[in-house]
């Protein structure tokens, strides 16, 4: 569960992260691959390998990160539902889906 999010910082299970993060179920890791607000398929390898029902992409506090259409299409062809939201909303959606018992993963951008 994501305890909180504010610009530049996540708190997950009581631990602070001042970087982008990936989440798979209740596991969290720093994600340092995202460069210049651009996503690539490589950013999603570990998430796809976990075989989630849903992947949430947190696009930053102001929604600056824009996932390319090709990435969304690739994920959907894998049978994965994709939700793209500003990071604050994406955190709430992640927690809600996790509470519902969904197999969910996420990539969350921590700043703009």
Where are the regions a protein language model picked out?
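Non-catalytic interface/targeting segments
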Residues: 1-41, 98-112
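Flexible, charged surface loops at secondary-structure boundaries
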Residues: 48-51, 99
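A short, acidic, amphipathic alpha-helical segment used as a generic capping/interface helix at domain edges
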Residues: 39-49
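A short acidic, glycine/proline-enriched capping/turn motif at secondary-structure boundaries
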Residues: 61-63, 89-91, 112
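C-terminal structural segments of small proteins and small subunits
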Residues: 81-109
């Amino acid at each position: 569960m994501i305890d909180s999010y504010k610009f530049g910082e996540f708190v997950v299970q009581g631990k602070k992260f001042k970087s982008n993060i990936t989440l798979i179920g209740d596991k969290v890791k720093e994600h340092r691959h995202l460069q210049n607000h651009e996503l690539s398929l490589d950013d999603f390898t570990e998430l796809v390998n976990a075989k989630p029902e849903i992947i949430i992409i947190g696009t930053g506090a102001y929604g600056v990160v824009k996932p390319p259409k090709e990435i969304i299409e690739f994920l959907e062809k894998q049978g994965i539902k994709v939700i793209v939201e500003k990071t604050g909303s994406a955190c709430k959606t992640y927690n809600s889906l996790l509470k519902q018992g969904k197999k969910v993963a996420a990539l969350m951008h921590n700043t703009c």
